[in-house]
């Protein structure tokens, strides 16, 4: 699986900005910053253990507003992810590229009713066409996670473009620090 396939599909026939070379790794570790009083912050590490990205989610926003930077000093913003809706049930998250003047590069839309039982998200290109899917690994496990053993059964999601697998998100079992492996 190679995450760059998704990045290339989103940018469809456009030249990839040089700054996106950080997206060329096969695996990442996403670790939530603990003891953050307001909002959420995540460090995203490359396979060598270096910070590849830093993400910050603003606190007290009615509409989601997530920023992805090259590092913790937040000097270069790579992506912005925002939603127009207040409720998260079937929200569409718009992904924009600030390096290219805020151009809209694609979206992620949660399938609201389906996600009650098993989380499902759709990848959309800039034109709003469905190009891929992220889906929780199993409906049976998803139900157990939601109603009984959520803390014992880490979530796992598989992402595809068409029928081609491009990514896998797996939450690592750790009751103290949230860690997700992205392959």
Label each region the model flagged.
Residues 11-183:
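Intrinsically disordered, low-complexity proline/glycine-rich segments
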